[in-house]
Regions:
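Ferredoxin-like iron-sulfur electron-transfer modules
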Residues: 156-173, 193-243, 257-267, 282-285
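Intrinsically disordered, low-complexity Ser/Thr/Pro/Gly-rich regulatory segments
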Residues: 189-190
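Residue-level detector of anion-binding/catalytic polar loops
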Residues: 149, 247, 257
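General detector of N-terminal leader/presequence modules that precede the first folded domain
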Residues: 1-128
């Protein structure tokens, strides 16, 4: 092992905002059965089948898409279908004062909900603007180039935060997450409901080669989803790993690999994601 790692070495470099401090301090309360039920009634009154979120591995190429990363195929599909597109600065990075990534490479909101956003009152004081499909596609490519992880979401919480709850089923987005500021890092402190929608892409696995791993701890610094543990001085991915790819990008030994199940069909996986979202959201407005 490269060094004797301490608990501090294994802590992710995540935002230390008042909201995250609150999540760390009080998140455990949401695991109590009675509070969990109250949480569900308040935040998911229509159940979970009308919401969805999907993490997409950054810069992931496989099968027939060796020349095109999978996230772009999905993003281009939905951007082409969107009637309205609004580009918004990342509220996570704006409120955290991010120094590592461009705050302008934020969310791509789509649909009639996006058309009804109050651009003067966006979360976190972010700024936004109406964009063309071409601008949205350029934005997505710039975000991937900047090392941000794309995530597709249709969530009630977003509609509430952006004050467009009346358009909940006509409002979805791509957000581009950094390991230092993403508010989703707080989900590991709360109950299992927080993780219900944040899924690893089907067929994707992330593995560490123990022969190459020197136990430097660099991967732990960028894993904000509690997806790693230490075993015999080596990093091991847990069931909570969402397959984002941050750890792959930072490993100095190239010991971590993002893999796709050879028995799975990437076209079917992509089509399943598209179908899952198109069943619950219409962004043509």
């Amino acid at each position: 092992m490269g060094k004797n790692l301490t608990k501090e070495d294994l802590k992710p470099i995540e935002r230390n905002s008042p909201l995250m401090q609150k999540a760390r301090k009080y998140g455990w309360l949401t695991k109590l059965p009675i509070i969990k039920q109250v949480f569900r009634k308040k935040h998911h009154p229509r159940g979970y089948d009308v919401e969805a979120a999907q993490i997409l591995p950054m810069n992931f190429k496989v099968g027939d898409y060796e020349s095109e990363v999978i996230p772009l195929k999905l993003m281009d599909h939905f951007i082409d279908k969107a009637g309205t597109i609004v580009l918004v600065q990342c509220p996570c990075r704006v409120t955290a004062g991010c120094k590592n990534h461009n705050i302008d490479l934020g969310c791509v909101w789509m649909g009639n909900g996006a058309a009804n956003l109050d651009l003067e009152k966006l979360p976190g004081g972010s700024k936004g603007r109406i964009a063309t499909k071409e601008e949205a596609k350029e934005h997505a490519r710039a975000a991937l180039k900047d090392g941000l992880v794309p995530a597709l979401g249709k969530l009630r919480g977003d509609a509430v935060a952006y004050n467009v709850l009346d358009y909940e089923d006509e409002f979805m987005n791509f957000c581009f997450c950094c390991n230092c500021c993403c508010v989703v890092a707080g989900m590991k402190y709360g109950n299992s409901d927080y993780k219900r929608h944040i899924k690893r892409m089907k067929g994707v696995t992330v593995t560490t080669d123990p022969e190459k791993c020197i136990g430097c701890g660099e991967c732990f610094k960028v894993c904000i989803y509690n997806g790693l543990k230490l075993e015999k001085g080596k990093s091991v991915h847990t069931k909570d790993c969402i397959g984002c790819g941050h750890c792959v990008e930072v490993c100095p030994q190239d010991a971590i690999a993002l893999n796709f199940d050879e028995n799975s069909d990437i076209d079917e996986v992509v089509d399943e994601i598209i179908e899952r979202f198109e069943k619950i959201v219409d962004i043509s407005g």
